[in-house]
């Protein structure tokens, strides 16, 4: 496996759950050739990125780095852990497949940018669509290989799970206002 350094760089923040193990697990399921040239993944929080000047343009919109769940640039990935976990109740994070899925969505999207830059440069102008396509491929590969036994129960319970998640998210939204 490619030697990728994982750094934790938080400012006045401690993640509600351990993230490092889930990150390493997700990386094990990415084909080796897609990780070549990727040397550092930094786990951080939005407060730590507030000092980064400038904005990032994505899909004709401009964002501050502190407002992004993940960032990719020339072999480095930054995962903004507090934003990744902010939309879901902490209770859900205690369920390892759910926590790993949340991290995987952002990590695999950023790896999609890396793959696009190295293997398909100039392939398409819409980099976000390409990164999302790679995210879907890598996440499907991971879920089929790692959590194959959850496929049938999740399929049967998905309408109920969607309802529960929607209500919890609505309740969180009400608490914020």
For the regions a language model picked out, list residue spans one by one.
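A metal-dependent hydrolase signature that marks the N-terminal structural subdomain at the beginning
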Residues: 1-78, 89-95, 175-177
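Long, well-structured alpha-helical subdomains associated
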Residues: 2-7, 17-20, 142-177
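Hydrophobic (often cysteine-bearing) scaffold residues that line and stabilize catalytic clefts
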Residues: 19, 104, 127
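Generic beta-structure capping elements
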Residues: 80-82
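Short pre-active-site segment immediately N-terminal to the catalytic Zn-binding motif
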Residues: 84-106, 121-122
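Active-site recognition of the HExxH zinc-binding catalytic motif
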Residues: 105-118, 131
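Short conserved catalytic/interaction loops centered on acidic-Pro-aromatic/His motifs
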Residues: 117-130, 146-150
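An active-site-proximal "capping" alpha-helix that borders the catalytic cofactor pocket
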Residues: 126-141
């Amino acid at each position: 496996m490619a030697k990728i350094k994982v750094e934790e760089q938080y400012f006045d923040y401690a993640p509600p759950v351990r993230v490092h193990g889930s990150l390493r697990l997700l990386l094990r399921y990415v084909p080796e050739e897609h990780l070549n040239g990727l040397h550092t993944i930094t786990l951080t929080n939005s407060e730590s990125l507030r000092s980064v000047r400038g904005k990032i343009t994505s899909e004709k919109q401009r964002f501050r780095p502190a407002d992004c769940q993940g960032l990719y640039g020339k072999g480095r990935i930054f995962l903004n852990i507090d934003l990744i976990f902010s939309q879901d109740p902490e209770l859900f994070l205690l369920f390892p497949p759910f926590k790993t899925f949340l991290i995987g969505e952002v990590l695999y999207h950023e790896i999609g940018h890396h793959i696009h830059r190295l293997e398909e440069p100039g392939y398409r102008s819409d980099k976000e669509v390409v990164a999302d396509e790679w995210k879907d491929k890598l996440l499907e590969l991971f879920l089929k290989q790692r959590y194959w036994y959850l496929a049938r129960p999740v399929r049967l319970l998905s309408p109920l799970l969607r309802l529960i998640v929607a209500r919890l998210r609505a309740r969180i939204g009400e608490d914020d206002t």
